[in-house]
Regions:
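RNA-binding accessory domains that recognize and position tRNA/RNA substrates
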Residues: 1-74, 84-130, 139, 199, ...
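Generic beta-strand/beta-sheet core signal
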Residues: 55-57, 100-102, 135-138, 179-180, ...
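Conserved G/P- and acidic residue-centered "switch" motifs that form tight phosphate/ATP-binding loops
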Residues: 80
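A short alpha-helix-loop-beta-strand transition element characteristic
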Residues: 225-233
Length: 289
């Protein structure tokens, strides 16, 4: 037995209440035995001002804070293992989440888009109903490929995506961006590359996986049920046009110089942000379009 008095005016103190209730139960069920160290069954009693709550064992849930109590954020959902786990981690800290995905047809397929929608649907079990914003990213991505130094392509693309994500976030009154980056996991996630991507826009970027290794991230992915969907073999836009030897320690000066040589990029980003497809994600809906 465990007792708690939310109503301190109740005449019996918690230990006394436990003794009385325990004696009552043993009187009704004499085959029971008391084991305070390793009980097979715990009964909880909570005294309130207008009654009492009685319940059995606690069932562990996700924990954390109620969704929505810490603000609103936009999660960059690529379709891989990391970004769904990042969304889950931040939802546990009370953020109300929406997702943004960058699609580059014909280089990326409809199946890749369906995969991301399925991931958003699986995450809705933890985050609640949300919106999935699908950005038509083909033209900005081709423009960067055709006009920028090959070794800087990945960081320039990440900066472009963050600028578009900020435009979408501002339109929907979201206060931060979320990414699934883990320090030094790939070339675009070194300290220098992250510093360059951070400088692209001014919304806070939350990176809950930054200190985790892949084994830890995969374990969470399996736990929340997104792993099997994440490993489906449909290519997303982050893996196309990838240079064989990207620069791992770019400087902000050379990144900004490369962007100065792409005067048409800002307009392409604006158009992409204004033509996003908005897909409502509801708990219990069909994962297919």
């Amino acid at each position: 037995m465990e007792a708690k008095r939310a109503d301190k005016t109740f005449p019996m103190k918690s230990p006394e209440l436990c003794r009385e209730l325990g004696a009552y139960l043993l009187g009704k069920h004499p085959h029971l035995r008391v084991n305070v160290h390793e009980p097979q069954l715990e009964i909880m009693v909570e005294i309130r001002d207008k009654g009492a709550y009685i319940h059995g064992p606690k069932v562990e849930a996700a924990g954390g804070l109620p969704v929505g109590t810490s603000g609103r954020a936009l999660n960059l959902l690529s379709g891989g293992i990391d970004s769904p786990v990042a969304a889950y981690c931040m939802a546990r800290r009370g953020l109300a989440l929406h997702h943004i995905h960058f699609a580059s047809p014909p280089y990326t397929s409809l199946r890749a888009k369906l995969k991301v929608r399925a991931l958003a649907r699986e995450l809705a079990e933890y985050t609640g109903n949300c919106q999935l914003f699908v950005v038509p990213y083909t033209k900005p991505q081709e423009y960067i490929r055709d006009n920028a130094p090959d070794v800087l392509f990945t960081v320039l693309m990440r900066r472009s995506m963050l600028r578009i994500a900020k435009l979408v976030a501002d339109q929907s009154e979201m206060e931060a961006l979320i990414t699934g980056e883990s320090l030094a996991q790939v070339a675009s996630q070194t300290m220098q590359a992250i510093a360059c991507t951070d400088a692209a826009q001014n919304l806070p970027i939350l990176r809950p996986l930054i200190g985790m290794d892949k084994t830890e991230i995969i374990a969470i992915s399996r736990k929340i049920g997104t792993f099997d969907t994440s490993i489906e073999p449909y290519e997303d836009c982050c893996t196309i046009f990838t240079p064989p030897h990207p620069k791992t320690k770019p400087s902000l000066a050379e990144i900004e110089a490369a962007e100065a040589g792409m005067p048409g990029l800002a307009e392409l980003e604006r158009i992409a942000a204004e033509t996003v497809e908005k897909i409502p994600i509801r708990i219990g809906d069909d994962p297919e379009f």
